[in-house]
Amino acid sequence: MRLLWEEEAWEDYCLWQTRDKKLLKRINTLLKDIQRNTYEGTGKPEPLKGDLSGWWSRRIDVTHRIVYKEQDGNIIIASCFGHYSDT
């Protein structure tokens, strides 16, 4: 599956490249796992509710989450900084 980034999510990802290489590595590992197993695997995948119904999150660390959804064979990344309530 191909990764498609919302603009803010891509900016967050680029920020991680200069801010924290360890968390960037974790994000890259999670992204690969999402492409292989969209709804299972590392990072404790969980479906989101309410306004974010249809989206999923995975834990980068205690504070940060990747928020994504599968659509038309692609993975759309909405956020990779902060918590999904910040999205």
Regions found by a protein language model. Give the residues of each.
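Enriched for short, Lys/Arg-rich terminal
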Residues: 2, 11-24, 29, 42, ...
